[in-house]
Amino acid sequence: MIESMSNGFYLVNEPALLKEVIRFLQKGFSWTTQRSSDIFDRLNSQEHKIPIGAMLVNNIPPEILKKAPLSHYQLVLENYKWFKKFTPSYFTGYNVLAFDIEFYRRMLFKSLIPDWYQTNTRGNKLHDVLPHVRAAKYINRNVIATKLNAKGNDSFKLADLSEVGNFNHGISHTSIVDCLNTIEVAKKIKEGAPEVWEASLKTAHRTDAEKIINSKKVFTAFEYFYGKSRPFVQKHIFYHVPYRWSISWDLKHHPRDYISLDRENLSKALQSSPKIIRTLKHNKNNVIMDKELGLKYEPYDKIGINEIMERSKILDENPKFINSISSILEDLAREKQESNQIEPLFEETIYAGGLNISPKDKENMMKFHDVDVKGKLGLIEKFTEERYSYFAKCLLYEEYSKKELPESLYNEMHRHFAKRLTSTNSEKWETFASFYKECDDHREKYKDDENKLKILDGYNNYVEEMEKKFLNA
């Protein structure tokens, strides 16, 4: 059975759950298509959330924001519990790893749900159709029809594939329609390039991908840049410290041209183009195929299997050279981290703040969702990390009225959000100033569309009322 969220679909093993799936979907999951971590579609909008363009794509009027039955926090909790019913599953979507999954993780993180790796733990796996359809199209041009973009390259936008393939199930960018269109694309891959489809299922989890990398040693992996897919026949040489990604040697380059270089010149070579090493982020569901596939394409077809394996052997016989590369990349990563002195917002610390949660914080997070407002207030100071205390304050401010909260906490958080919203600088979040500019830009874009203009006027009025609550904070 197949079920949907946003522009993706998830594989479910229980047909009896279909009715529940559809009923839940009808509540609206378009919030996962939003491109801002502070804005949520089809949710009960808090007074510090500002609607922007992604809502306009789905023609969502401001009335929906005011009348939705669930707050954002309530929907996150409900969604988390709902996903648990389908564990283990493949969480599949279109470009889902670039946005949707990261978005969902951050929603769990900010909602104090400690299981923010829900979609790739306890047997769950992440599966992204976009890189697979790109690779499939490279291998077999007839897999799926595409249109050319302005640069003359195949367009892999889901809306374009749906239009050209004549399988559009409705208005693109709505959650269920995009899901159904994604399923159609997945079918095309499975039917037209079954080897790609099977390979994609085998790399849907980091540990599965590592097993393939470690067993194959030499393999073909696809990368997509400058609007085109490219196969690389490569030799895995080590896992990056500290990022844990697979670092491979591109076997179009002969190792003997680099083995004798001193550290300084080797470092320059590693940072020059064309790249002699490839970084395979194997937690991103990459397409990893047999080496023989890449040998069908330039320039590897001219090098040949014997020379490819000879180059691989040379790398095996020179561990000191490999260690030098590893050391250089580790130093470069450290320098990059040290050069970035900008203090991240608490909302940005899902990785920077460390991946492990202390047992005490995890226990308090679980309690937070089960106790009343008094109990929640009592937990604020019990968290060992400031970011968790901050998230608790945010949730209390969003979920409870002013009269239910201590005056000091309400004022603290009200001023905090007022400072953010009234900023006139270019910020990472939506401000009143950035909203009004975007609203004016959309008015110009849709000047001949009365329906869009009416919705935009509604957004403008909605935000003007919101602004009044914060100007004197």
Which stretches of residues belong to each language-model region?
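Entry/capping segment at the start of metal-dependent catalytic domains
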Residues: 1-35
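A short, charged
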Residues: 267-307
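C-terminal non-catalytic accessory extensions
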Residues: 409-473
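Conserved DEDDh/DEDDy metal-dependent 3′-5′ exonuclease domain
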Residues: 55-141, 295-364
